[in-house]
Amino acid sequence: TGLIYVAARNAEQFTARYGGINRVVFIKYDALDELNIIATPDYIIHGAGLASPELYTSKPVETILSNFDGVHSLLSFAKANHVKRVLYISSSEVYGKKRSEKPFEEGTYGEIDIDNIRSSYAIAKRASEMLCKSYCLEYGVDVVIARPGHIYGPSSKQNDKRVSSDFAFRAAFGDKIVMKSSGIQKRSYCYSIDCAVQILTILLKGECGQAYNIGHDEITTIRKMATIIAQAGNVKLEISDPTENDIKDFNPMNNSALNNDKIKKLGYVDTFTVE
């Protein structure tokens, strides 16, 4: 049996989550710093980076560099140390906005507004994906890409302001849920355990240089998600007008539903529904 190295910035958070597992080892790591890893792993899963909408606008430089420089250093490490495979966790935001109501397939893309500072995240993910594909083509580094949609579950942090996490924590504390939009936006909400299974499926069965959606067959609106959580927590659901700061952080994609056919061909099957 091998070891699992968890590279992260915060040792206290690591201990709280993984401290009782003997095979899991902490490595101090910041995607913005120079890579300093003594061990040579067989597989690398790169999921580091800023993942909160309010940071995309307040820290766009760090948002871009933690993605691009972070994956660049790991790809270079993998090339030099003959790592078996690298999996880069990208995002469904690489797809951008489109007029069609159909779920996104991996080869279908919409528009990303390069003048909107919030696009720092989506553009960084697109650039990082291209770097992964380039390392695969030019240097033969075995790398695959995962594109998660909207993931929810018990691993969420209380300061996570994405709607599924924010709504869940409000309901858990008995507070009313406040929606800042009509909630008609379409999403592919995926439970964290299903997400983990899909990541491992891509890691073990995916094709080098290819990207795979991580989502769920069930397409859900934000309003439906809010209603389900409010009912489960027995709290009120209200709609209020968004502030300018709220609007600045909004995901511009009214439809970010994902087509899961490609990962299903690797043998993956959904387990959990939103309900």
Question: Where do the protein language model's features map onto the residues?
Answer:
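Active-site beta-alpha turn of Rossmann-fold NAD(P)-dependent dehydrogenases/reductases
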Residues: 48, 87-92, 147-149, 215
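Conserved Rossmann-fold NAD(P)-dependent oxidoreductase catalytic core, especially the SDR/UDP-sugar
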Residues: 46, 65, 72-118
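C-terminal substrate-binding subdomain of Rossmann-fold SDR/epimerase-dehydratase oxidoreductases
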Residues: 171, 175, 179-275
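Active-site helix of classical SDR
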Residues: 120, 124-127
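Conserved catalytic-core motifs of eukaryotic protein kinase domains, centered on the activation segment
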Residues: 17, 54-62, 97-102, 156-157
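NAD(P)-dependent short-chain dehydrogenase/reductase
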Residues: 98-107, 130-187, 192-201, 227-232
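N-terminal Rossmann/SDR dinucleotide-binding element
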Residues: 1-43
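NAD(P)H-binding glycine-rich loop region in Rossmannoid oxidoreductase-like domains
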Residues: 28-66
